[in-house]
From Swiss-Prot:
Belongs to the LDH/MDH superfamily. MDH type 2 family. One of its GO terms (molecular function) is L-malate dehydrogenase (NAD+) activity. Its EC number is 1.1.1.37. HAMAP family: Malate_dehydrog_2. This is Malate dehydrogenase. Catalyzes the reversible oxidation of malate to oxaloacetate. The gene is mdh.
Length: 327
């Protein structure tokens, strides 16, 4: 059996984490031969509820669960951490402007970025789930100068999975037969679900669906799926978000399938003309615990306009919290 790895989860008593932690402990994220120590962070008022979650984890008697730490102290939660899933974030309250939400989360993620910098393994892999995920990831990354910016990612895998599901339903095929689905940009309603390179049973997806459906049905459905779930369920996506987080880390740690890619919010190196330093969703392949952006895709005018629109939103979000970002 391998030595245990330390997995930090923030917002650990929340809805997403309740769907996430048991699957991590069962080996769904890092494999059935990888023991884990869960290091669970919550705000002080939620520590009692977190204790209850820890009791339930104990009661599952998971063979791979080598230990549990519960704390409200980031320096304890991130100590020697190998993986961190930053799930906890300030939700948008009534009458709250977007810039207020950005500022409230900037305070949270700057503290966590510093704690990661000072206490975590230098090889840590960080996934930000809490929204606004891309900009929260940027804030954490900028507050961790001793950690490579490549180690901070944001989750667009839920959007990617939604895109797969919508296309599978439309074409009457199994999700297993679809490759190269793609989300560009921000995890928000400006994201661009791009089918120009997607294959269904090896055939170009856009040869199987009409352009009108693609532009006026598929794209807005994927963009607005989160809001549709809130309207239906009375609460935001939790189990599907947890599932996507597991998919994201598993592929990053263990590798993506041959002849396919995944969508990941990663540090832009200027690929496809996207401003360097933004956390932007690109097509990525992973192997040996590292990711790289797929290069050489043709970008037509339609795609370029959509990619630029979501880039602009990310620039605006960054500029709104500029004074909170270290130089």
């Amino acid at each position: 059996m391998k030595a245990p790895v330390r997995v930090t989860v923030t917002g650990a008593a929340g809805q997403i984490s309740y769907s996430l932690l048991f699957r991590i402990a069962a080996g769904d994220m890092l494999g059935k031969d990888q023991p884990v120590i869960l290091q669970l962070l919550e705000i002080t008022p939620a520590l009692k509820a977190l204790q209850g979650v820890a009791m339930e984890l104990d009661d599952c008697a998971f063979p791979l669960l080598a230990g549990i730490v519960t704390t409200d102290d980031p320096s304890v939660a991130f100590k020697d951490s190998d993986y961190a899933l930053l799930v906890g974030a300030r939700p948008r309250g009534p009458g709250m402007e977007r810039k207020d939400l950005l500022a409230a989360n900037a305070a949270i993620f700057s503290v966590q970025g510093k704690a990661i910098n000072d206490h975590a393994s230098k090889n840590i892999k960080v996934l930000v789930v809490g929204n606004p995920a891309n900009t929260n990831a940027l804030i954490a990354q900028r507050n961790a100068p001793d950690i490579s910016p490549r180690q901070f990612t944001a989750m667009t895998r839920l959007d990617h999975n939604r895109a797969l599901s919508q296309l599978a339903t439309k074409t009457g095929t199994s999700i297993n037969n679809i490759t190269k689905a793609l989300i560009w940009g921000n995890h928000s309603s400006t994201q661009y679900p791009d089918l120009h390179n997607t294959l269904v049973d090896g055939k170009p997806a856009l040869s199987l669906v009409d352009q009108a459906w693609y532009e006026s049905d598929y794209i807005p459905t994927v963009q607005q799926r989160g809001a549709a779930i809130i309207a239906a369920r009375g609460a935001s996506s939790a189990a599907s978000a947890a599932n996507a987080a597991i998919n994201h880390i598993r592929d990053w740690a263990l590798g993506t399938p041959a002849n396919d890619w995944v969508s990941m919010g990663v540090y832009s190196d200027g690929s496809y003309g996207i401003e360097k330093g933004l956390i932007y969703s690109f097509p990525c392949v992973c192997k040996n615990g590292d990711w790289e952006i797929v290069q050489g895709l043709d970008i037509n005018e339609f795609s370029r306009a959509k990619m630029t629109a979501t880039e602009k939103e990310l620039q605006e979000e960054r500029d709104a919290v500029k004074e909170l970002l270290p130089a």
